[in-house]
Amino acid sequence: MSKAVVFGSFVVDLMARSPHLPVPGETVKGSYFKMGPGGKGFNQCVAAHKAGADVVMVTKLGKDTFGKVATDTMDSLNMPKEHLLFSDTEDTGIALILVDENTAQNEIIIVPCALNTIT
C-alpha cells in the first residue's frame, strides 16, 4: 500500500448558486446552497485515501462547529486524525463560493483562520 502525508488546508465550503454573479453593490437572490468539507489539501487527502493509499492529513482546525465537520467527515471515511492540530483562539477556515448557474463561473473568498497559525 502507498503511503502519503498531506500537509494542507481543510476549510468548510459555503457554496451558493445564483442566476448571475452580483456586481459590486448588488444583492442577488440565490437558487441553491450547500455546506460541506473542502480545501485543496483535504480534497487531495480524500482522493488518495479512496485510491487505497495509507494517508494522513496535517492541518489546523478551530475547536468549533466547522472543526467538527472535519473530524466527523474523517471519521465517516475511516481516516486517521492523530496529526490534526487545533487552535485555542482561531476558528476553522472557510471558503465562500459563489457560482453562476448559467455559466458555471465562480468567485471564491478563502478565510484561512486557524490555518494562518500553523507553525
For the regions a protein language model found, what residue spans apply to each?
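Glycine-rich phosphate/adenosyl-contacting loop at the front of the ribokinase-like
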Residues: M1-K60, G67-V69
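Conserved N-terminal subdomain of the carbohydrate kinase-like
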Residues: E26, M35, K50-T119
